[in-house]
Design a protein with these regions (language model features):
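C-terminal anchoring/interaction modules
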Residues: 1-168
Length: 168
């Protein structure tokens, strides 16, 4: 609950390895979905929501990465990945809306130079955000694959030990 308040203010909140990640996902994912819905219906201001979206995306992605190691949370992680895809789309769309607002504002302030600088800054910011999202996605996928591999190895080892015991 406290973390959601911090995330709603656009603050980055680190994920601690020994937390109950399933509970965190149950709390954070609906809040993110609600934020996306508010953005889609026009209830939320894109300029104000963008940092919140980014902070929530980062935190939930990190939490899902750690939760991926728990077989009991497999369904929760799959649902979270789906919501993260919606969040990624919302971030990209919001970035475009913010860029348009910045272009319009630069035009109102006057001058081609101001428009060009605003466009360049916005494109750079958009590129950085897309790179960050791509990196987080890759890290999440890699963590899930690693955890599954570790589980498969543990199951194989347990079966081999059982067979060895039965044959001895």
């Amino acid at each position: 609950f406290f973390e959601n308040q911090q995330l709603q203010q656009g603050q980055n909140v680190p994920v601690i390895a020994n937390e109950l990640h399933g509970v965190h996902l149950e709390i954070h994912v609906p809040a993110l979905a609600q934020l996306i819905e508010a953005l889609n219906t026009g209830e939320a201001d894109p300029m104000q929501v963008l940092p919140v979206l980014q902070a929530m995306y980062q935190h939930i992605s990190d939490t899902a990465q750690l939760a991926a190691g728990d077989p009991a949370l497999e369904a929760e992680v799959a649902q979270t990945k789906q919501v993260l895809q919606f969040a990624e789309e919302a971030i990209n769309n919001t970035m475009k809306a913010v860029q348009k607002l910045q272009r319009d504002q630069a035009e109102m302030e006057g001058g081609e130079e101001g428009v060009a600088m605003a466009e360049q800054d916005a494109k750079m910011q958009e590129h950085e955000i897309k790179m960050q999202i791509a990196q987080e996605k890759a890290e999440l996928d890699m963590a899930i694959k690693q955890k599954k591999h570790e589980q498969e190895m543990a199951i194989r080892d347990a079966k081999a030990a059982l067979e060895f015991r039965e044959n001895s």
